[in-house]
Amino acid sequence: MLTGKHFLLKAPTLGIEIVGDYREAVRVPAGEIVEILEGPKPDDKRSVKVRWRDKTLVMVADDVQKRGEEVPGPRGNG
């Protein structure tokens, strides 16, 4: 389970932001940290919900793990 973990992205990585009925591709640049909020779920092992800055995105779990490096979270959060 990746929930609660933080990853420093070493390469630009694509995420999807869902706003109402619309989905928008968002490129998260290398050097940014994403926090896994949820996932992957047993019925969908491919996607995770992440927080990046003030956005909530859906990303491919494999992309986050292969293009990122797990780092400690903010103090008190792991």
What are these regions (language model features)?
Residues 51-78:
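Boundary regions of SH3-family modules and the immediately adjacent low-complexity/disordered segments
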Residues 1-42:
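Beta-loop motif signature
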Residues 32-61:
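SH3/SH3-like beta-barrel superfamily modules
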